[in-house]
Amino acid sequence: MTSELGIFYRSDFDRAWCDMSAETIKFTDSAAQRVSELLAEEGDQNLKLRVYVTGGGCSGFQYGFTFDEVVNEDDTVVEKNGVSVLVDPMSLQYLQGAEIDYTENVSGSQFVIRNPNATTTCGCGSSFSV
């Protein structure tokens, strides 16, 4: 079952949970393009980008990115331009309303999460608190 935003649901319970939260996760075109390029380099188009939140960093929580072949039963899957992003339920509560982007500028290039739930961030921007 798919919503108009490319979010896939495994059950009606998941749909109810995702309708209130996952549809507010934004995955930009530039992020999808960069992930697509990385997948081409890996040579495995079955990989998906997993975005997660874990404890750590100077502000209490930090973001993580990894490629994953396994879609867990309780994962939320967001698709954009043929790229799949996986978010586990624990991370989803911290990422509600967030935008996942990829930026390039004179300082370098990086994936950026703009998270409205983050009340403070560290100086380097790699950790946050809620």
UniProtKB/Swiss-Prot annotation:
It holds the Pfam family Fe-S_biosyn. Iron-sulfur cluster binds at C58, C122, C124. GO terms for biological process: iron-sulfur cluster assembly. GO terms for molecular function: 2 iron, 2 sulfur cluster binding; 4 iron, 4 sulfur cluster binding; iron ion binding. InterPro entries: FeS_biogenesis (IPR000361), FeS_cluster_insertion (IPR016092), FeS_cluster_insertion_CS (IPR017870), FeS_cluster_insertion_RrpA (IPR023063), HesB-like_dom_sf (IPR035903). Its cofactor is iron-sulfur cluster. Signal peptide: none annotated. Keywords: Iron, Iron-sulfur, Metal-binding. Transmembrane segments: none annotated. Binds 1 iron-sulfur cluster per subunit. PANTHER family: IRON-SULFUR CLUSTER ASSEMBLY 2 HOMOLOG, MITOCHONDRIAL. Belongs to the HesB/IscA family. HAMAP family: Fe_S_insert_ErpA. Homodimer. Required for insertion of 4Fe-4S clusters for at least IspG. This is Iron-sulfur cluster insertion protein ErpA 2.
